[in-house]
């Protein structure tokens, strides 16, 4: 199995880390049958690749063997964004019969976290994602990993995301705050339903907590009241963090 080094790991603040822990926890409550999860968005640049990557990282950090599949065959940014180097094979190589699965799966320097990169842009992305090899790929990964996170193209641009979502156990829709209208989001939800996809929920991304001042102040107050005394006494905060994620979910 080839190995790549992830050189540009994002440093997340406390709120963001807790948000991913909450998302991770919510996914675990969907049940053991929901292991292949696709993530899509309405339009480009809503942050779906970052959410996919950080969610997969969070699952791996929790001890879950996780693989991130970059199925955005038209405009992938994963390798460039995280400066992983030059992998030899990717998803498009496998789907077109130019490589085997073991050639395309890359081990990373993060324990329990593997990646399948998109590979070079093919002339027929939709046809490749709709062929039997992609179905077989997900079935094989399901037998090997606890979670398979699939980053897909925006549904408002091309049909690829719906094709992948149909092969997944469930789909999460990423919505950029103050950018996507209710009508646009409903249109995407309708597309997923017509394609027979199961929508697990939505993630509101790029929220400006300074504008949402009331929530931000509440969170800071809650954080201090929950952790303040323990931090002063030097207690281990790992367990309260889990409890905080549960509380936030409510």
What are these regions (language model features)?
Residues 1-6, 186-250:
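Hydrophobic micro-sites
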Residues 2-21, 25-32, 41-46, 53, ...:
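P-loop/Walker-type NTP enzyme "switch/lid" segment
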Residues 36:
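Walker A (P-loop) ATP-phosphate-binding motif of ABC ATPase nucleotide-binding domains
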Residues 59:
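Aromatic pocket-lining residues of Rossmann-like dinucleotide-binding sites
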Residues 77-78, 124-126, 182-183, 209-214:
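Switch/connector loops and helix/strand junctions flanking conserved nucleotide-binding motifs
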Residues 143, 155-178:
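Inter-motif core of Ras-like GTPase G domains
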Residues 150-152, 204:
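Hydrophobic residues in beta-strands of the RecA-like P-loop NTPase core, especially within AAA+ ATPase
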